[in-house]
Amino acid sequence: MLSVCYSDPCLSDFCQGKRPLRIASRNSNLAKAQVHECISLLRSWYPKLWFQLSTTETTGDREKKIPLHLVENSYFFTDGVDALVHKGVCDLAIHSAKDLPETPSLPVVAITRCLHPADLLVYADHYVHEPLPLSPRLGSSSLRRSAVLKQLFPQGQILDIRGTIEERLDQLHRGHYDAIVLAKAASLRLHLHHAYSIELPPPYHALQGSLAITAKDHAGKWKQLFTPIHCHSS
């Protein structure tokens, strides 16, 4: 398969480092870390490969007051990024796989192996030394996570939370919440160290921790390039 990519006129320039892969992503630190992770995986197979990154906002980045359960399985966190590919500005887009809409606007050419599927409940720092209140304020961005929290904390107040990982942690440390839910994969990718956190029990999102790569033209060719890092069980 690798020899096919090196000999294919559509792919050989990328594999040999003669042209950069033009990658689109959101402009958060997490999104950029995901791009570097994906390219690092590819470079294990194509050492000369390099890339140029274009970042942009999506509707979800701009509209931070809309509860996420109202826009699940939509283009909320992919529209602006995929638009760069549609316009020909970029060759590929890299997304958190769980952000993909039910019907993606571009062909999905690969989904990477899950880094970690779990959710973390991250506590405000002072709860290292004291118990949570009887009715803790718990920040969650999905119905699935909220249902798990309700089981663990029947008297808890489940409050919506939005923003980047850094913005959510800032809200936690400024006292807006007693604890918040984050994807463990996000913490790992950003090398975050929480003073006190616990891993929540399942269910987890089926694609949490995986990355999705979308393309417009030559989708079959791109699938060949990404075959070494595509997880066939995803």
Swiss-Prot record:
Q: In which pathway does it act?
A: Porphyrin-containing compound metabolism; protoporphyrin-IX biosynthesis; coproporphyrinogen-III from 5-aminolevulinate: step 2/4
Does the record bear Signal in its keywords?
A: no
Class of this enzyme: transferase
Q: Identify a single GO molecular function assigned to this protein.
A: hydroxymethylbilane synthase activity
Keyword Transferase among record annotations: yes
Q: A single GO BP annotation from the record? A: protoporphyrinogen IX biosynthetic process
Identify the InterPro entries for this entry.
Answer: HemC, Porphobilin_deaminase_N
Q: What is its EC number?
A: 2.5.1.61
Reactions the enzyme catalyzes: 4 porphobilinogen + H2O = hydroxymethylbilane + 4 NH4(+)
- Which Pfam family, an example, fits this chain? Porphobil_deam
Keywords (A to Z) from UniProt:
Porphyrin biosynthesis, Transferase
GO cellular component labels: cytoplasm
Query: Which segment of the chain is annotated as a signal peptide?
Result: none
Which family is this protein grouped under? Belongs to the HMBS family.
According to its UniProt entry, the function of this protein is described as: Tetrapolymerization of the monopyrrole PBG into the hydroxymethylbilane pre-uroporphyrinogen in several discrete steps.
Identify this protein by name: Probable porphobilinogen deaminase
Organism the protein comes from? Chlamydia pneumoniae (Chlamydophila pneumoniae)
